[in-house]
Amino acid sequence: MVPAIPETPVRKFNINFGPQHPAAHGVLRLVLELDGEIVERVDPHIGLLHRGTEKLMEARTYLQNIPYFDRLDYVAPMNQEHAFCLAIEKLLGVEVPIRGQIIRVLYSEIGRILNHLLNVTTQAMDVGALTPPLWGFEEREKLMVFYERACGARLHSNYFRPGGVHQDLPPELVEDIDTWAKAFPKICDDIEGLITDNRIFKQRNVDIGVVSKEEAISWGFSGVMVRGSGIAWDLRRSQPYENYNDFEFDIPLGKNGDCYDRYLCRMQEMRESTKIIRQACEMLRKTHGPVLSEDNKVAPPRRAEMKRSMEALIHHFKLYTEGFKTPAGEVYACVEAPKGEFGVFVVSDGTNKPYRCKIRAPGFPHLAAMDWMNRGHQLADVSAILGSLDIVFGEIDR
């Protein structure tokens, strides 16, 4: 008689993905529970880049707080400043001059392209294509130069101000941006030629990480994550801010809500942003005037005026030491950032500093759904799904 082999309990295999994994987008640590090659549970560990931004902001004036927003989603910095400035303008009831609005739109769209170039090409890198990131970074470098020529900094721009933007754009810069925008669709074609119909890229992304319309809404997704599932929700259209109503652009939608559709949406969004950039350059040629509000409560006096008038000098000094006071109240402002709806909820107690500032990072709910999206997928699909979520840790950990 053959002795019965004692049953050994099957132990699930646990594996750490990150924080120093090349596909883990920064400092993400995922604890994966595997059954063979199949993912059963994903446990994201966040907080490794937590800097206490929201708490720090309570001890700074409104103007001193703007640079903190560059450090959230550091791939497209100006889009975050935008939301904070809109919130302050809502509190104060300040109007932005039309030229200032156009410049804001122009640089928000440049930020969108910066973000999508990085995401689309690194998504390809996560599944094994090593050429696209090199091409993407070449274009990002040109856009970084436009950032630098507008405000002097390549990354942490600190360019938007309550009431407009810090300084006007020289005409040569507008021409150079327009020239770049004319040539950019060709670059998009090159990148698409490399990966859109690539057999391996499709096998790794089609029908992976599918999100239905209902699920996207109940998880609190925004941006490409809902548009990839076929929901036409874009704040630039549905709740227009600045002068987006004056621009003609389409909102690309996916059908299947998988990683591949989200990739296609981002590719098409870059083309739409290029259209907006061309229109903005055309508008800037025709529209002249101030780029910062004339309201002296929030905007500093002109440099020439300060050289003549003592009052203007005092005014400037007070504005930059004490800052301006906002009326007490609560306000929420949001923009369509490249990753989704970036919102800022400011509670003001009538002083020169915010009483509380809550930042709604679009990547946070996306990462929260990581566990649900990966269940039943292969281990190799984790990096493909993570790549299509478009996660940057600056804004998730804040």
From Swiss-Prot:
Keyword list (alphabetical) reads: Cell inner membrane, Cell membrane, Membrane, NAD, Quinone, Translocase, Transport, Ubiquinone
- Origin, by domain of life? Bacteria
User: Its principal location?
Assistant: membrane
Q: Where in the cell is it found?
A: Cell inner membrane
HAMAP family associated with the record: NDH1_NuoD
Q: How does it assemble?
A: NDH-1 is composed of 14 different subunits. Subunits NuoB, C, D, E, F, and G constitute the peripheral sector of the complex.
Q: Which family does it belong to?
A: Belongs to the complex I 49 kDa subunit family.
This chain's function reads: NDH-1 shuttles electrons from NADH, via FMN and iron-sulfur (Fe-S) centers, to quinones in the respiratory chain. The immediate electron acceptor for the enzyme in this species is believed to be ubiquinone. Couples the redox reaction to proton translocation (for every two electrons transferred, four hydrogen ions are translocated across the cytoplasmic membrane), and thus conserves the redox energy in a proton gradient.
Q: What is this protein called?
A: NADH-quinone oxidoreductase subunit D
**Annotated source species:** Caulobacter vibrioides (strain ATCC 19089 / CIP 103742 / CB 15)
Q: Which gene encodes it?
A: nuoD
